[in-house]
Amino acid sequence: MPRVKAVKKQAEALASEPTDPTPNANGNGVDENADSAAEELKVPAKGKPRARKATKTAVSAENSEEVEPQKAPTAAARGKKKQPKDTDENGQMEVVAKPKGRAKKATAEAEPEPKVDLPAGKATKPRAKKEPTPAPDEVTSSPPKGRAKAEKPTNAQAKGRKRKELPAEANGGAEEAAEPPKQRARKEAVPTLKEQAEPGTISKEKVQKAETAAKRARGTKRLADSEIAAALDEPEVDEVPPKAASKRAKKGKMVEPSPETVGDFQSVQEEVESPPKTAAAPKKRAKKTTNGETAVELEPKTKAKPTKQRAKKEGKEPAPGKKQKKSADKENGVVEEEAKPSTETKPAKGRKKAPVKAEDVEDIEEAAEESKPARGRKKAAAKAEEPDVDEESGSKTTKKAKKAETKTTVTLDKDAFALPADKEFNLKICSWNVAGLRAWLKKDGLQLIDLEEPDIFCLQETKCANDQLPEEVTRLPGYHPYWLCMPGGYAGVAIYSKIMPIHVEYGIGNEEFDDVGRMITAEYEKFYLINVYVPNSGRKLVNLEPRMRWEKLFQAYVKKLDALKPVVICGDMNVSHMPIDLENPKNNTKNAGFTQEERDKMTELLGLGFVDTFRHLYPDRKGAYTFWTYMANARARNVGWRLDYCLVSERFVPKVVEHEIRSQCLGSDHCPITIFFNI
């Protein structure tokens, strides 16, 4: 109550001074004398920020005691809200009695103002910058225009604001409007106490003033002018967080073109139309400007929140990626650490094997046996990497061994490929799956013809169309060439024969298989020669059904020919008939080449009156293979399959002299076989 009396005395003193017309002009109180207290409460909530501008400019303009009685009307000008102005003209006692809470706030605001002069070092600098903006002129001229034009729309705008920001301000009184922000003001008043406690010159009343100022600032968005000035002034204070200051300065510059109240309303409308995120930012700025130095800390917090959320969203995505990479690196690191010794030791083994190959074949088997348990000790991940290393080392060693062997074979022509003198023959048939003719030529595959000098040379899996044949194979001196490979075919077969055949037939009479090129039949005087490349069942037996269809067609075809003449079948049959015909029969029962279906079809074929010449001569020989996968250095370890055969009619078996497997001949994953006949 004593504060109310002080206000009355100050109001009486001001009534005699010429400062009274300004609040009358700003308030337009003559028209609103009959209005209710509720309308008076609504309007002040809107004009609060402008009153602050006037007070700040007045305090910065004059620090003498004469300004202090003017500060009371400016506090009343904070009552631009039309409360104190109406009280001066319409009856001081009654109006003061109604807004008791406001009168206390006004006194609280009027009392600490002389104390503000103590820390003027910090506060006066930004206020001095605000002086060039004619604050009293704006109060006298622009506010009445803005209010006269926008008193009712401001209520609508305030309602719109309250819907998005503080819904309690439009419907409630000054106390109700102050209550919801009190909770927020308490949260933000704590840093003000901490920051303002450092100079030690400001009392509790000033803290209350800051709280009330913060409350009012939250209730309105007209603080854009003060925000602009504060944003321009803040870079000086924002030396601690320079990054946030730069962002604030940019945002302040964006708001600069609206210094007037009308511009403020436009900016507020634009902000209301903008999404709530953008509207939330100016709110926090208004709070920051009222709290003074707290803006330094509060702005980075409020502004950092959206950035932090974005950073979290962005961080959450790369962070797990990094963790996954780290975890994958850890897992891969373990594998790599385990794989590195394997890769380092294995090429060492491969290097040892390469010279061993040149020396003895028996040592290769011993080294392979020694290497097996070492690999068995390693983990499966390391084993998965072994084939790649072994392929490279194997390919290198095979090339070296190939050159060495070709040189030795050239020198050992008769010794390596000739039969003993006691075995007489007059026909030599050689068969080889070259796994690509052009690659085979680059690996000096044609040397076999010079070394072996076969009478008939059968090739499978040439993978080369007739119009794409290299010149080296189009014309071999002394041979009649017969090719079958359709364009785009992946199979392809060919026959080179020194003896002119009576008739040559291409294919099996089925488009499904003849389009690829799988069989050529050459009729000679005393037999039929069939050069065949049987379809592979494929991984996971995807081609097993076509393979079964082929088997039926082939059996019918061979049976028809065998009724006319003896038949000699050479080529890649893509099956290991018996467990002795492959290194690991138990592990391959469900793999292509050793399925029960394929083996049964081979048994059926032999049951039609045909004989496997190799098993006829060497029924118990083990380790006799014609195919080795490129993986796991299988050929060096002789982990292979016998897939290439020479089958003859039973009546032609007595004419078979020898069946040789030329495992020393490189250039393909298969090796050639040579059959000697004495017809």
UniProtKB/Swiss-Prot annotation:
The active site is formed by 533, 572 (proton donor/acceptor)
List the residue ranges of the region (Disordered): 1-407
Q: Where is this site: Important for catalytic activity?
A: 644
> Which GO BP terms, alphabetically?
base-excision repair
- Site description Transition state stabilizer, residues in chain: 574
PROSITE patterns on file? AP_NUCLEASE_F1_1, AP_NUCLEASE_F1_2, AP_NUCLEASE_F1_3, AP_NUCLEASE_F1_4
Molecular function per GO: 3'-5' exonuclease activity; class II DNA-(apurinic or apyrimidinic site) endonuclease activity; DNA binding; DNA polymerase binding; DNA-(apurinic or apyrimidinic site) endonuclease activity; double-stranded DNA 3'-5' DNA exonuclease activity; metal ion binding; phosphoric diester hydrolase activity
Subcellular location field: Nucleus
Q: Quick one: where's region AP endonuclease? A: 428-679
Give binding positions for Mg(2+) 2: 572, 574
Q: Which GO terms describe its cellular component?
A: nucleus
Q: Per the record, where is site Interaction with DNA substrate?
A: 670
The PTM Phosphothreonine maps to: 133, 140
The UniProt record lists the EC number as 3.1.11.2
User: Could you tell me which PANTHER family the record lists for this protein?
Assistant: AP ENDONUCLEASE, DNA-(APURINIC OR APYRIMIDINIC SITE) ENDONUCLEASE
Quaternary structure and partners: Interacts with the zeta DNA polymerase complex; interacts (via the N-terminus) with the accessory subunit PolZ2/Rev7 and also interacts with the catalytic component PolZ1, however the interaction with PolZ1 is likely via PolZ2.
Return the protein name: Recombination repair protein 1
**What organism, scientifically named, is this protein from?**
Drosophila melanogaster (Fruit fly)
